[in-house]
Amino acid sequence: MKKKYYISISLLMTFIVLVFDQVSKWLITISMKVGDSYEIIPNFLNITSHRNNGAAWGILSGKMLFFYIITIIILIVLVIFYIKEAQFNLFMQVAISLLFAGALGNFIDRVLHGEVVDFIDTNIFGYDFPIFNIADSSLTIGVIFVIITLIKDAIINKKEV
């Protein structure tokens, strides 16, 4: 019999992502000055200490109250979505856990520091991608997983009709 909710997996996933996110940001803040950069893989990956008081690409810089309110709403919506829409679907529950962990990780930074610590600096196919962190990666992977699940469900539902 399939379990309705995989709470322990979801909580563990959220906890692991949050720990890696917060510890990595702490290590960056204690060991590097803003702007310091270390090349890890030439022409591909650097660790660069950066701060962002906005969202992706620095949009809405300095709008902390907005981010506090929106993040709290998003976290509540994710919990509701998990309960109402993710029953019996481990993949969707993992996706929501990744989204929750990513949103919470950056929220913690905003509350404690007034900005988000970013440090993963990549050059992908010649494009100097904006600097990001583990929470951002978790959000991105979570969104991809949600999209995959929705497409898969749409295909299955179409076959059943």
Swiss-Prot record:
Residues the record marks as active site: D118, D136
Pathway: Protein modification; lipoprotein biosynthesis (signal peptide cleavage)
Coiled coil: none
PROSITE patterns: SPASE_II
Enzyme Commission code(s) on record: 3.4.23.36
Main EC class the enzyme belongs to: hydrolase
Protease as UniProt keyword: yes
GO terms for biological process, alphabetical: proteolysis
GO cellular component: plasma membrane
Single GO MF annotation: aspartic-type endopeptidase activity
Membrane topology, record value: Multi-pass membrane protein
Keyword Cell membrane among UniProt keywords: yes
Role description: This protein specifically catalyzes the removal of signal peptides from prolipoproteins.
Similarity comment: family membership: Belongs to the peptidase A8 family.
Protein name: Lipoprotein signal peptidase
